């Protein structure tokens, strides 16, 4: 059994890792463990260095503590500060751009066992992979609206990056009592990781990279 530590932003990601990713990877003889960062990002506060000095320090420490194991992240790309390493990339293809940014951050952190990963554009984006699952938490009109949003983009990872139209903002507007942790996990379980991977190529690449560790020496 190989261990992978996923440095993440909060309880929503922690629940997803424990309830969805852990059983999936366990079958590949990989155990994933969430580590919640202590630096909270908010809309009104941006930290120096984009991926802040504190995040970099915590992630570096984690990598050194587990130097023979793999460390990755589960951070929202949405609302990252402008001075995040690599964020000045002008590549129009979001999937190429995000890989460049992740590689730039990896170079900045400079730990061989670290692979930075962003959720495009945030965790809630992957929930648009299967709009029919929203019948569990919303009425038929809302489900139809979510279908319309999903159908308007090439992938759920393209649902865009503004305070009004980010995936979580859309869900909060459509479902006033939306509970991020509880509903996010419920919806993810219903749609299943295979559907999410099919619809979200950047997420799929991350999962496949972790899976590849199971066959590595």
Name each model feature, range by range.
Residues 39-52:
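N-terminal beta-loop-helix "entrance" segment that forms/cooperates
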Residues 1-4:
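Extreme N-terminal starter segment of soluble prokaryotic enzymes
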Residues 6-8:
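Short hydrophobic beta-strand that contains or immediately precedes a catalytic carboxylate
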Residues 10-12:
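Long alpha-helical, hydrophobic tracts
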Residues 14-41, 56-217:
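C-terminal accessory helical subdomains adjacent to catalytic cores in phosphodiester-
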């Amino acid at each position: 059994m190989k261990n992978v530590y996923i440095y993440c932003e909060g309880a929503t990601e922690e629940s997803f890792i424990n309830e969805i990713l852990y059983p999936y990877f366990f079958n590949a003889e990989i155990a994933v463990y969430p580590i919640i960062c202590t630096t909270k990002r908010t809309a009104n506060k941006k930290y120096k260095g984009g991926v802040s000095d504190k995040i970099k320090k915590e992630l570096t420490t984690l990598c050194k503590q587990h130097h023979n194991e793999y460390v990755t992240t589960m951070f929202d790309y949405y609302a990252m500060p402008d001075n995040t390493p690599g964020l000045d990339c002008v590549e129009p293809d979001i999937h190429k751009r995000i890989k460049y940014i992740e590689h730039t951050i990896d170079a900045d952190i400079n730990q061989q066992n670290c692979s930075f990963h962003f959720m495009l554009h945030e965790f809630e984006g992957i929930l648009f992979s299967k709009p029919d699952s929203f019948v569990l938490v919303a009425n038929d009109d809302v489900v139809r609206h979510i279908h319309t949003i999903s159908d308007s983009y090439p992938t759920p990872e393209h649902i865009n990056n503004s305070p009004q139209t980010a995936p979580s903002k859309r869900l909060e507007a459509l479902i006033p009592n939306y509970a991020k942790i509880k509903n996010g996990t419920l919806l993810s379980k219903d749609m299943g990781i295979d559907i999410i991977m099919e619809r979200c190529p950047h997420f799929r690449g991350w999962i496949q990279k972790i899976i590849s560790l199971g066959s590595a020496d």
